[in-house]
Each structure stands twice: as C-alpha cells, then as structure tokens.
C-alpha cells in the first residue's frame, strides 16, 4: 500500500510541475517568480532519479532529464546559473548531472559539470580553508553548505580530476568538527563566523547559538554521501567520515522523541513553540539507513532510522478519502543574518513558516522510504500494516 501511495505522490507532483514552476518549490510556487537553478529542485530531482533506480520506471528518468534539460544547454551552459555568484547552494543540483552523463553519454552534461566545478576554484574561503557559504555571507561556514558542495566536490575529483581535491574536501569536514561541534552534547551548531563579527556569532567561538535540526540533517547526509563518493584507496579519509557520522548519530539519538521524530531545535524537545519537524528527521533517517546499508555503521543503528521514518508516516503523512496525499510539518526556510534579523535564537527557528509538500521535506522523505524499502518487503514498512 505505502509503495503505491508514494509512487502516486511522486507522480502527482511531477505531473503538476514544470521546470518553470515546480509545485514542490514553495519558495516560488504561486508567487510569480521565475524559477532558477537551485538546490531545492536539485534535491527533488535526486529523489526522482532514486525512484527510477529503484523501480526502473522510465517515467521518472524522463521527468528528471526533461527538468534538467530546461536549464542545461547543448554548450554546457546552465540557464540562470552564474558561478561568480559564489553560492554553494547552486552546486547541489549539479550532482544529478553525474548520473545523466553516465546514462546518456551526452557531452553537455560533462561540460556543465566542468562549469559548476569551476566555481569552487575561486569560491571565497575562510583562512582555515573552508568555502564561504555564499559570497554575501563573508567568512561564514554553514552546515548546509557541506551537503550542498562536498558530495559534488568529492565525486568530481574522484571521477574526473585524479582525486586532486579529495584532501581539501576532507579538511573542510575536519574544520567543521573542530569549529562547530559542541563538546558537551556532540551536536553541531548551524553556523560559524571566523571573523566573530556577525550579530548571531559568539564573540569568543564564532558559533551560532542553537542546534537547528535540518542543518544537522544536511550535515549528516553530507558525511554519508561524501564517504560514498570517496575512493576506497583513501581508507583513512573514509574512516574519518564514517567515524564522524557515527559520533553525530550517537549524539542525535539522545534527543530523538519517543515518536521517532526529532525537534526543530534539537535539544529543546517539548519547549513551548518547538515542534517535530519533517525535513530534518527525514534527512537523518536517510543518512542512518544508507550508512547501515553501506556498512559505515553497525546494523544496530537501523532501528533509529526506521523509527524516524515511521514517526513521519504516523504524524505528517496523510491520505484523504479522495486519495489526496499530503506530507506536512516541513520548515520552509531558516538561515542566519541576511536582510531579515535571523539571529539563530530559539524564537527565530520556530518562527519560520511550516508548510506541506515542499521539496526540502518531500525529497529526503522519498529517499528515506527507498532506504527502508531496500531493507524490508517493499510493500510493507515496519510498523505499518
């Protein structure tokens, strides 16, 4: 039953979407904005291609390819993408080009990969070597950026660049552990300002003040996806990534709600205004189950990923009498600084809109489902009849 429901859900979203106006991108849907090359669509297309790999259904491949082809031109240029914008978020969607290039052999995808990779050659960096999250966020590292850039970076270097930049990628993870991990809890702060000048940054440590769930979900899956992309020849580097991930999971599960889900502000479960959030929970579920499948962490950890996925099913996944499917509990956006006074406080994180059927929740939910399905009878998810 769940298999059919999720298939129907994905196909509905695809049928109601175009590259110009994807239904799953609530930041532009219905607002009259032109769609651009972005990480939100990148995540959804990644999930759609995962559905194709799992089912072999050509509808998924064709939909993903058509979407990407709206942006990627024959000469390898990408409509609306400018490397000199120096926005790490814009790297993420290019991860889909590796698979499309492998499947089709079309040179435009390789040229587009080279174009996106060129951004990293001149992306501004903090003194310790990490990429700035965006050119507009000087001297700042956000956990989000690890997911947006590092799996792409490691994959490109391994496939096309004789592993030249692999050590650089690993060093950036090591700096995050050094600068953004909280020694007391083992959790990671959302952002780090090397200059200590931002109003949200601790003047001593440069860290932002709270543990935002989706940022930790991005980081968790960044560790697993980058580890997967790292050559077996780099044993110590792969071991560092898997050990770091296991340490993170050990910290997170202490804060897992009895429902299986995680809280928007991770360590403050039950505090008034806090809520169980879908996107971060789904990212963590995906990361845990994928890491178990790839033997990065022991089988005993799978229970936490399955419990997280089932928690989402129980609380936020619904099917109406007329068959309409909804996935709720998704934080639309959250960040630090910028034009809005985003100060990283508890009050800030719980103030952002909560929406339904948005890619930042839908995409990792689909990927978590596929990881569960890979473990179990695909027609039945543990705990659900």
Predicted segment positions?
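Acidic/His metal-coordination segments adjacent to aromatic residues that form catalytic metal sites
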Residues: 72-79, 125-135, 195-209, 263-273, ...
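Long, well-ordered core segments of solenoidal/helical folds
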Residues: 3-24, 62-79, 111-130, 163-192, ...
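Oxyanion-binding "anion nests"
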Residues: 220-269
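Acidic/serine-rich, low-complexity amphipathic helices located in mid- to C-terminal regulatory regions
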Residues: 144-159
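CBM-like carbohydrate-recognition segments
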Residues: 2-40, 59-61, 70, 74-88, ...
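Inter-helical turn/loop segments and adjacent helix faces that build the functional surface
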Residues: 55, 104, 156-167, 226-239, ...
């Amino acid at each position: 039953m769940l298999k059919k429901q999720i298939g129907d859900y994905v196909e509905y979203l695809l049928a109601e979407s175009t590259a110009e106006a994807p239904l799953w991108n609530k930041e532009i849907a219905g607002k009259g904005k032109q769609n651009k090359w972005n990480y939100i669509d990148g995540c959804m297309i990644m999930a759609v291609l995962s559905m194709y790999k799992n089912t072999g259904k050509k509808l998924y491949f064709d939909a993903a390819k058509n979407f990407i082809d709206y942006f990627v031109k024959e000469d390898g240029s990408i409509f609306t993408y400018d490397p000199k914008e120096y926005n790490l978020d814009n790297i993420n969607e290019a991860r889909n080009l590796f698979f499309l290039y492998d499947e089709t052999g079309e040179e435009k995808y390789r040229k587009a990969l080279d174009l996106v990779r060129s951004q990293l050659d001149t992306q501004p960096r903090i003194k310790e070597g990490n990429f700035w999250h965006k050119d507009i966020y000087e001297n700042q590292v956000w956990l989000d950026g690890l997911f947006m850039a590092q799996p792409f970076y490691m994959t490109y270097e391994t496939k096309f660049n004789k592993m030249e930049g692999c050590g650089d990628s690993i060093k950036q993870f090591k700096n995050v552990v050094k600068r953004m991990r909280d020694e007391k809890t083992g959790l990671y702060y959302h952002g780090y300002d090397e200059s200590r000048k931002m109003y949200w940054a601790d003047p001593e440590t440069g860290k932002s003040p709270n543990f935002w769930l989706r940022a930790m979900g991005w980081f968790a899956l960044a560790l697993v996806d980058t580890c997967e992309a790292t050559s077996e020849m780099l044993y110590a580097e792969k071991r560092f990534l898997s050990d770091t991930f296991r340490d993170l999971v050990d910290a997170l599960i202490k804060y897992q709600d009895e429902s299986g889900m995680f809280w928007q502000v991770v360590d403050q479960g039950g505090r008034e205004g806090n809520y169980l959030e879908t996107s971060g929970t789904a990212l963590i579920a995906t990361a845990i189950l994928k890491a178990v499948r790839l033997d990065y962490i022991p089988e005993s950890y799978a229970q936490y990923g399955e419990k997280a996925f089932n928690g989402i099913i129980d609380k936020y996944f619904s099917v109406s009498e007329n068959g309409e499917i909804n996935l709720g509990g998704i934080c639309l956006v959250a960040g630090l600084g910028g034009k809005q006074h985003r100060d990283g406080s508890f009050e800030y994180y719980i103030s952002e809109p909560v929406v339904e059927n948005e890619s930042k929740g839908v995409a990792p939910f689909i990927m978590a489902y596929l990881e569960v399905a890979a473990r179990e009878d695909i027609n039945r998810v543990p705990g659900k009849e």
